[in-house]
Each structure stands twice: as structure tokens, then as C-alpha cells.
Regions:
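Flexible, gly/pro- and Lys/Arg-enriched active-site loops
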Residues: 11-12, 35, 42-50, 61-143
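Extracellular and analogous surface-interaction loops
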Residues: 58
Length: 143
């Protein structure tokens, strides 16, 4: 099972999540199971609250190809992709507002690391809302 987290804090957040789910289902030829939607404060920067959701599906798409599809959908929904920005003083990654954010959280039981992608996602354990939504969707999947 593959688990993606979706988040939006700009525009019509619920609609952004809906369109992202629809585009992912179309791109992956798979109907996702969806968690509840949870509103959370922005983490790592001052900004509007996020709506977050986790979706799961089965697919044989390769991890890097899945990342490409996710980034294409983010761009289509108005999120530009460029190199991550870092604070020159602290070296910490700078976060920002976004119409949509799609992260691959878990890809089956795969442990994977390249310059572009780490699986499971490094923040899968450190963000309580992600754990909550993962637990919610696993219950819906009867896992």
C-alpha cells in the first residue's frame, strides 16, 4: 500500500485537496482510499492553517515516477517547483504557503534513499497530524 499526504493552505483548500485526489487517481489509474481531513497550523513558518489528508492506493508505479507525477500535479495546481530554500544562518529548510503539497509518506515496506526521495518520508513520525491521519486511513483499509 502506498500512502500520500496532501496539504493546502492557500485558496479553496478543500477544493485543492479534491482536485489533487482526482488528478492522482487519473494519473495512477487507481481509486484512493481517503482519510478524514484535518486542519493544522502551518509548521516552520507563519501562514494560514492547512487542510491535510492522507490517501492510500495500490500501484506498481516506481517510487521516482510517483514523485514525478506528484510534482506535476503540484505544478498544475499552482505550486512552482524549484530547489528547496534554506536559511543561510541556520541551514534549516524554509517552508512556505502552498496551494497543494503532495508527499509520499510510505511506499509499501520499501526503505529507499536518493537525492530526490527518501522513503519512508523523514517526517512520517515527527508530525503528529500525519500519524493521526495514517492511523485513520489504516482503520478505513482494515489494516
Amino acid at each position: 500500500m502506498i500512502y500520500l499526504s496532501l496539504g493546502s493552505n492557500l485558496g479553496d483548500r478543500a477544493e485543492n485537496l479534491r482536485v489533487a485526489r482526482e488528478l492522482l487517481a487519473e494519473a495512477l489509474q487507481a481509486e484512493p482510499v481517503c482519510s478524514a481531513v484535518l486542519e493544522t497550523e502551518a509548521i516552520g513558518f507563519d501562514g494560514p492553517a492547512f487542510l491535510n489528508q492522507v490517501i492510500s492506493f495500490e500501484s506498481d508505479i516506481a517510487p521516482e515516477a510517483l514523485l514525478d507525477r506528484c510534482q506535476e500535479i503540484e505544478e498544475k495546481l499552482g505550486r512552482p517547483h524549484h530547489a528547496a530554500m534554506y536559511d543561510p544562518t541556520t541551514g534549516r529548510r524554509l517552508y512556505s504557503n502552498r496551494t497543494i503539497d503532495i508527499d509520499i509518506m510510505i511506499y509499501n515496506d520499501l526503505e529507499y534513499h536518493t537525492d530526490r526521495l527518501t522513503l519512508p518520508h523523514p517526517q512520517v513520525q515527527s508530525r503528529p497530524f500525519v500519524r493521526t491521519l495514517l492511523d485513520n486511513i489504516k482503520q478505513r483499509n482494515n489494516l
